[in-house]
């Protein structure tokens, strides 16, 4: 293999992995249980945590940007097989955009430590940031109080997201130990 071919392969690998994780995000988003609030329970947060934990700040955040942009141009990657700017402009849009913030926080911390508990802490911070951004967005669009927004969009999801954090941290730790994903 000549040097030029090796360089192209090395450059392409992270982008391919980002594409794979963006596809994982879509599949995780499709597995959803609708709620009366309009914010469904789905596995998207698990996808965000896995991509950021495995890929770090740069590529974890890039993966979420790709995912959001694919949805914005109309591909049905969001919950309920939806896509388009109307989804981002709607009540759940803040949570979807918040995935980028979550990935940035988790990826930044995860790439700087090998500690399982630091990874769990990073994931908790990332999910809280996503909750904050998404809930502020929801409260603004729905013209409700922040307390009502928390009651509708955060509190019902806490047990599910705690499970997702635990599962993601365990999977990321295991993937790190096996060196399956190298960037």
Give the role of each language-model region.
Residues 2-5, 13, 18-20, 27, ...:
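Short helix-perturbing small/polar motifs within transmembrane alpha-helices
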Residues 2-61:
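Hydrophobic transmembrane alpha-helices
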Residues 11-13, 57-62, 112-118, 145-146:
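Membrane-helix interface segments
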Residues 15-20, 46-50, 60-66, 92-97, ...:
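Hydrophobic alpha-helical transmembrane segments
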Residues 19, 23, 27, 50, ...:
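Generic alpha-helical transmembrane segments of integral inner-membrane proteins
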Residues 29-40, 68-102:
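Interfacial aromatic-anchored transmembrane helix boundaries in multi-pass membrane proteins
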